[in-house]
Amino acid sequence: MDDASTLIDVKEYSDTEVQKNRVLTLEEWREKWVDGKIGFHQEQGHQLLKKHLDTFLKGENVLRVFFPLCGKAVEMKWFADRGHCVVGVEISELGIREFFTEQNLSYSEEPIMEIPGAKVFKSSSGNISLYCCNLFDLPRVNIGKFDRIWDRGALVAVNPGDRKCYTDIMLSLTRKGFRYLLAVLSYDPTKHPGPPFYVPDAEIKNLFGSTCNIHCLEKVDVFEERHKSWGIDYIVEKLYLLTEK
């Protein structure tokens, strides 16, 4: 695993047993949206994505970009405005509707026949499709393959016991020559139960190392006042670029 040169020294906790049995239900995630407890949403978009956008897109046009656990990420419109095709999956219908409303995009909705109770929301322009369903049900629907995956707030939100299954689904969606941008968080997992969950380097290597080249692009101190209520005194975001071996 290559590492970016950085002045930030992050302690790695090899023993993540403390979080391994932590489980959040889909209903709990829906409730977070209803209650407005969405501190993970970034109204201005993700700054590290902006900084490394050229590395991610590599100058290519008309790419298919996948957003796992997309919420109402403003970056979806960034990519659509650049002519790319965006597909996301999100359990909260409220989050999806807020995305289209806040981005002033008209849309349609239709049921997903393969998944009872699920829906897909499509922009009138046709290049944004957001699936409202459990991500782990997604393999039942043929959503095609993707050139790019932007994984921010997804791997860190998946229950730790589901990470292998999650990773298998993500990699099954990739096209040849894919580029997968992954943002994870480092903090002391003995002080905060998650989510977002702590994902150490060793876990990334274990999940992706057999099929992907793993390169750490940057590490950034993202500690804010709100993090004090988590009981932690530091939190570092790491951005990885995963490419096909």
From Swiss-Prot:
An example Gene Ontology biological process: methylation
HAMAP family, A to Z: Thiopur_methtran (MF_00812)
Pfam families (UniProt xref): TPMT
Name the record gives this protein: Thiopurine S-methyltransferase
Compartment annotation: Cytoplasm
Modified residues (Phosphoserine): S14
KW Cytoplasm (keyword) present: yes
Organism taxonomic ancestry: Eukaryota, Metazoa, Chordata, Craniata, Vertebrata
Major site of localization recorded for this protein: cytoplasm
Record note on quaternary structure: Monomer.
Modified residues (N6-acetyllysine): K58
EC number, UniProt record: 2.1.1.67
Family assignment from sequence similarity: Belongs to the class I-like SAM-binding methyltransferase superfamily. TPMT family.
GO molecular function ontology, one term from the record: thiopurine S-methyltransferase activity
UniProt key word DNA repair: no
Organism: Panthera tigris
PANTHER family: THIOPURINE S-METHYLTRANSFERASE (PTHR10259:SF11)
Catalyzed reactions: S-adenosyl-L-methionine + a thiopurine = S-adenosyl-L-homocysteine + a thiopurine S-methylether
Enzyme class, broadest EC rank: transferase
Residues annotated as binding substrate: F40
Residues that hold S-adenosyl-L-methionine according to the record: 29-40, 69, 90, 152
UniProt keyword list: Acetylation, Cytoplasm, Methyltransferase, Phosphoprotein, S-adenosyl-L-methionine, Transferase
Gene: TPMT
GO CC terms of this entry: cytoplasm
